[in-house]
Amino acid sequence: MFTWLREKISNYIIRYLHKPVWKYESFSVTSPEILETYLEPGDVLLVEGNQRVSSIIKFLTQSTWSHATLYIGDRASHHDGAPLNLIEAEADGGVKAVPLSKYKYYNTRICRPTGLDKGEITQLIDYAISRIGHQYDMKNIIDLGRYLFPYPPVPIFVRRRMLALGSGDPTRAICSTLIAQAFQSINYPILPEITKESIETCQHKYVEREIYHIRHHSLFTPRDFDLSPYFSVVKPTIEKGFNHKAIRWEHQKSSPEKNGAA
């Protein structure tokens, strides 16, 4: 009885949270064709969503980004041959592969891990692909249901703790935790906790060394890949050769007087 009621409430919240907001500004949309040119397997593609749930996540994380996907290249394809380049976790389908074109009208950002060899990238993508078909963590939906109001009264110092969403069940996932687990499977850092300890050398001197601690995957949010010092931000406009001198500004248009017109 309780399970049935919980599922009914979850489905209602899903429908509510996934309705688009009335205003979405596309400041920096990159076409799928250009994105695909500069994306590399293993890249994280962040998305600024246009749904109610996106607004909640952006508010709680104080970030532009509300969704995270993993670019897998040509490792998966639809039955009709259409490429499925991204792996993501969403409430309306669990973990699945989707085409890059799904986000052609959205603001996006490419975050790239550094120094991975081909074997590690393969292992990373294999991990994500092996999760396809896993259910979305519905406890996350219940958690987000607490923040249906546009601006919940959440103190800044507790926002991170409140975003420890989900049940922790390894067979269920949300977008950022799925990708965090994939990178943790190859021991690649995102935002680890770092402590220092003193060790004595053979010369009886003490030196400090840093110890990295893996944070629980449920604590990760999309913005962490943007903030991480271990991921570089790739901007296609810059990569393809940006020249600011080629821009024609409105205020620089030639006036009729300058052209000798009467």
Can you name each region flagged by the protein language model?
Residues M1-A262:
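Cysteine-nucleophile amide-bond enzymes
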